């Protein structure tokens, strides 16, 4: 392994550690845990996933209609309106913005 390769790998590990320790990543992990521990959010996620799965099967079979699509969209909107999900989605967006900025800098 050349010195340059070792240095690049070391820099990559350091970058990974810095990202993992960033406020954005920590906030995302906390928000994710809050969603995982919220019974209402988990139930709504299950319901949304079931509706989405059924819609995808119907779409593949040519049976999907606008009403079933609206039903999926409404379930998603209700899920996203939960305060715990709003915090999760905000934290996810902030982390993604940070990662995009890091990627552009590289």
Where are the regions that the model predicts?
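Acidic, polar-rich N-terminal leader regions of halophilic archaeal proteins
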Residues: 2-106
């Amino acid at each position: 392994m050349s010195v340059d390769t070792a240095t690049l790998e070391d820099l990559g590990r350091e970058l990974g550690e810095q990202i993992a320790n960033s406020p954005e990543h920590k906030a995302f992990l906390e928000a994710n845990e809050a969603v995982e521990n919220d019974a209402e959010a988990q139930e709504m996620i299950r319901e949304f996933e079931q509706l989405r799965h059924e819609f995808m099967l119907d779409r593949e079979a040519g049976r999907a209609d606008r009403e079933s699509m609206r039903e999926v969209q409404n379930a998603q909107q209700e899920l996203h309106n939960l305060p715990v999900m709003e915090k999760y989605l905000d934290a996810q967006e902030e982390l993604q913005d940070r990662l995009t900025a890091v990627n552009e800098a590289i």
